[in-house]
Amino acid sequence: MGDLHFLHTTPAQPWRVQALSAMTSAELGQALGGDDAADWLEAAAACGLVEAQLKLGRMLLTGDGLASDRRAAFACFLSAAGGGNAEAQNLLGRCFENGWGTAVDREAACNCYRLAAESGDFRGAHNYACVLAADGCIAGALRWFERGVAGAPLPARLQMLKALTHHPRCAVRAFAMRGLESCPVASTDQSA
């Protein structure tokens, strides 16, 4: 990782905060160790760095490196989503859908998923399509499923398509089967 002596100085300087927000959780933990990583991420998030808000929110949601705090995670995702981060918009939708740190609000979840999908987040597109399909808007759902699958890395694409093979709507199952047949890895994978 190189010489990271600068990390042990005040986190208020913007370039330091940006450098920290660009690190993965594992890199932060390695560079700073445990609580220091969380402190630096909190400082970066408080300075308004969207990536730090997103990263801190994920850590708080999962309890990775910090005690799980879904209310605080929700607040981080709300801030990052307000900064235009598509992944945070999707995660905010998950919070609304599942009641993580906030009251369950299906309409707010749908709006967050739509924003994430429109911003290019493949998970947001998938989640928005699931909401549309549940509401009976199959044509719209299929368009968003297609966009989500097209934008996903191969492992996520395969996971999404395999899950959709069990969807209650026949048209969605057919879409998933066609998608799996066109994936070179899926068509040669005998264990699936």
What function would you assign to each model-found segment?
Residues 4, 152-192:
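Terminal, low-structured helical/coil segments at or just beyond the last alpha-helical repeat
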Residues 13-15, 29, 33, 46-49, ...:
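Short helix-capping/linker turns of helical repeat alpha-solenoids
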Residues 22-29, 55-62, 93-98, 127-134, ...:
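Hydrophobic face of amphipathic alpha-helices that form TPR/SEL1-like repeat modules
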Residues 30-39, 67-76, 103-112, 135-144, ...:
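Structural signature of tandem alpha-helical TPR/SEL1-like repeats
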Residues 42-44, 78-80, 114-116, 147-148:
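Canonical positions in the second alpha-helix
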Residues 51, 55-64, 71-103, 107, ...:
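Alpha-helical adaptor scaffolds
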Residues 54-55, 90-91, 106, 123-128, ...:
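Alpha-solenoid helical repeat scaffolds
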Residues 111, 117-118, 133-156, 177-185:
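TPR/TPR-like (Sel1-like) alpha-helical repeat modules
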